[in-house]
């Protein structure tokens, strides 16, 4: 029998002196640190899994329950009321003498930016899938995000106790929908109501959990007779899968002595770190089964900071990032470097900046350089966070994820370094908002607070934007979906005590061009007795989808001063903020500056800006402008009795049904629907399915609006 040990807090001072005083031995070896994220589709059981991890590692005395609104990680009122994760939350725990820094990320598509910035600074991830649903739409999104950052993963097939749970089907969905190479390292004993434990394929033992202590202890017993053949076949498949991608294990597998569990474990680790395989565990977090195996997998298979490539940054030349790069190894002896990946307004500690330390050490009270702003900042406090609780630290070291108090000016994505060794890390990028609505204060007192509250939330959330409508003067807030903006407004009223009125949500359309044109702009005007003159020629062409606006200066060297070329580019980009059909941003344009005329003493920045913006707008009008709308990938799950009504309703909303499949006793409809047609869909689906249907959606792409719909949108804009 394996028994969970006594409660031991993972906190503790690092016990090191300030920068420059010499590096003392680490409390936790760098090889024993795991920086991981927990990621999943909404309702896969991600937060419940995190709560069980905290319980089994001794971080909490009793696991929190999502349904009761009593979880450690979902501490916002809005999270507890809705039973979902809205903001990523950080915590730390210990397992087998390893420190595990965990970031629990949201599963709802509206909060994908939280996942994006977390994956940027993490070394590994746990992907949680529902044993019934398998891979779902948001699962695909976060998986692609992890692919982009090259983050090694393990998977946990959760909810094996639920009706319709099927481990094999869930694993197969990873192959079909993610293109992954999953390798089960545990198998379920039973399913649905009969799920009672797991088989460890490395040890070839069964684990039967004890209900009286919430699964903290379990019996190790021989594999049940009826599962021996399946388990042996699965272990052979596991060894063969690893041997195919790991030469060292292949030699052992073909040798006479066979493969020991330790050798197999080492081979799985190498294959996981290389991104060739994904170890898969199974269990039920709610029913306290299988989570300890997952913890073992985090320690055994996910990378330490030493296992990840060193960071590369650009060296500053006269304060500007140049083409020359520098490498920072994950080592306490290297110059300090870190990335600020999250800003949070804490009611007790003030403004917090979460950072990942990539190299060197940093002591409280010391000064760092914010390379992104060029400003020196003194660190007042260093904190290790446990959701909304905090523990003071004397020092942060390589591999640590900590919160910092003391920055006067900092943004998500800023690079922090030692003053004497500056370099700039790549900035973080986020998807553009797809929805917006007007907001106004109810009273004069609210008006004074509105701007500060909106700015504070925009600082926290890079996917949330605040803009002024240039025509009406209204304040407009932009976000990733209805729920995103609903949460913003709710926080305004609860946290910032600002009463406000909001308009109806509107779709964030975009504009582009359909053909290549040449356009000219000229500005010649006498202002205050001085002539202002500039003339430019632009070639405007359709660009690659998702490319934004690209600008190339093709004017002969020396024919135009560089500062004027810079003003032209800045004006072109600014002009693209307002389109020519309905005032929506112009995107995916390839702009070339091919002509320019200037006169010494008469040409100015203002002149070139006006000439360039005029040329851009005139050219866009002549280039067959096109209105674009966001189209969503929609997945609707309903009982078979309602399939016809729901499908017909989707078709009536300009939806395209692209496939159907059976999932347990339900039918799953895969469709693509314009976002504007999905407003209020949750209410209508409840009516169509007698409350038994559920749906999820995520952005697929932008595509041209049908001509009839586009005419109505432009008519409303012209009459505004």
Where are these regions (language model features)?
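Structural and coupling elements of P-loop NTPases
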Residues: 2-720
């Amino acid at each position: 029998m394996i028994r969970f040990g006594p409660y031991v807090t993972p906190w503790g001072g690092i016990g090191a002196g300030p920068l420059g005083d010499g590096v003392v031995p680490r409390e936790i070896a760098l090889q024993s640190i795991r920086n991981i994220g927990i990621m999943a589709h909404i309702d896969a059981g991600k937060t419940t899994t995190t709560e069980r991890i905290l319980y089994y590692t001794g971080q909490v005395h009793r696991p929190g329950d999502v349904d009761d609104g009593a979880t450690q990680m979902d501490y916002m009122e809005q999270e507890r009321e809705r039973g979902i994760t809205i903001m990523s939350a950080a915590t730390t725990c210990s397992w087998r003498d390893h420190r595990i820094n965990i970031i629990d990320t949201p599963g709802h598509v509206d909060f994908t930016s939280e996942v994006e910035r977390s994956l940027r600074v993490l070394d590994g991830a746990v992907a949680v899938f529902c044993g019934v649903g398998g891979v779902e739409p948001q699962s695909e999104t976060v998986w692609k995000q992890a692919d982009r950052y090259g983050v090694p993963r393990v998977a946990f097939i959760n909810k094996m106790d639920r009706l319709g749970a099927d481990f094999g089907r869930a694993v197969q969905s990873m192959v079909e929908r993610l293109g992954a190479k999953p390798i089960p390292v545990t198998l379920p004993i039973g399913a649905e109501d009969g799920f009672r434990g797991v088989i460890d394929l490395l040890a070839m033992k069964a684990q039967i959990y004890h209900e009286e202590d919430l699964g903290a202890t379990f019996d190790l017993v021989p594999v049940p007779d009826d599962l021996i053949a399946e388990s042996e076949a699965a272990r052979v498949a596991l060894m063969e899968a690893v041997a195919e991608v790991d030469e060292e294990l292949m030699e052992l597998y073909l040798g006479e002595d066979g493969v020991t569990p330790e050798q197999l474990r080492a081979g799985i680790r190498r294959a996981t770190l290389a991104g060739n395989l994904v170890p898969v565990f199974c269990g039920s977090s709610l029913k306290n089964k299988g989570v300890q195996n997952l913890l073992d997998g985090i320690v055994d298979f996910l990378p330490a900071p030493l296992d990840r490539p060193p960071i590369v940054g650009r060296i500053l030349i006269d304060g500007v990032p140049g083409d020359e790069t520098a490498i920072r190894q994950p080592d306490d002896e290297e110059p300090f470097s870190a990335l600020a990946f999250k800003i949070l307004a804490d009611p007790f500690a003030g403004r917090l900046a979460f950072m990942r330390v990539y190299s060197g050490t940093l002591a409280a009270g010391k000064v760092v350089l914010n390379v992104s702003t060029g400003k020196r900042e003194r660190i007042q406090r260093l904190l290790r966070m446990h959701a909304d609780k905090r523990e003071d630290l004397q020092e942060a070291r390589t591999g640590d994820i900590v919160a910092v108090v003391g920055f006067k000016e900092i943004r998500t994505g800023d690079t922090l370094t030692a003053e004497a060794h500056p370099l700039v890390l790549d900035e973080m990028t986020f998807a553009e908002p797809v929805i917006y609505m007007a907001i106004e204060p109810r009273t004069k007192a609210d008006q004074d607070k509105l701007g500060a509250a909106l700015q504070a939330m925009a600082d926290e959330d890079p996917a949330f934007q605040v803009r002024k409508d240039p025509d009406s003067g209204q304040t407009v807030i932009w976000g990733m979906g209805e729920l995103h903006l609903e949460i913003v407004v709710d926080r305004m009223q609860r946290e910032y005590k600002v009463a406000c009125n909001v308009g109806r949500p509107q779709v964030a359309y975009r504009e582009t061009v359909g053909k290549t044109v040449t356009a000219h702009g000229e500005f010649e005007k006498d202002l205050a007795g001085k002539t202002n003159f500039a003339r430019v020629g632009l070639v405007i062409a359709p660009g690659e989808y998702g490319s934004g606006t690209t600008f190339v200066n093709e004017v002969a060297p020396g024919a135009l001063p560089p500062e004027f070329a810079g003003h032209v580019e800045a004006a072109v980009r600014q002009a693209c903020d307002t389109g020519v059909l309905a005032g929506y941003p112009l995107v995916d344009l390839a702009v070339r500056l091919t002509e320019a005329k200037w006169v010494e003493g008469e040409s100015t920045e203002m002149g070139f800006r006006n000439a360039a913006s005029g040329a851009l707008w005139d050219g866009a009008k002549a280039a067959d402008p096109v209105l674009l709308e966001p189209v969503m990938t929609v997945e609707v799950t309903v009982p078979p009795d309602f399939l016809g009504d729901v499908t017909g309703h989707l078709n009536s909303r300009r939806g395209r049904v692209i496939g159907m499949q059976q999932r347990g006793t339900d039918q799953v409809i895969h469709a693509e629907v314009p976002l504007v047609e999905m407003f209020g869909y949750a209410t209508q689906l409840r009516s169509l399915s007698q409350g038994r249907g559920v749906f999820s959606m995520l952005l697929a792409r932008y595509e041209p609006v049908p001509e009839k719909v586009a005419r109505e949108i432009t008519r409303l804009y012209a009459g505004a």
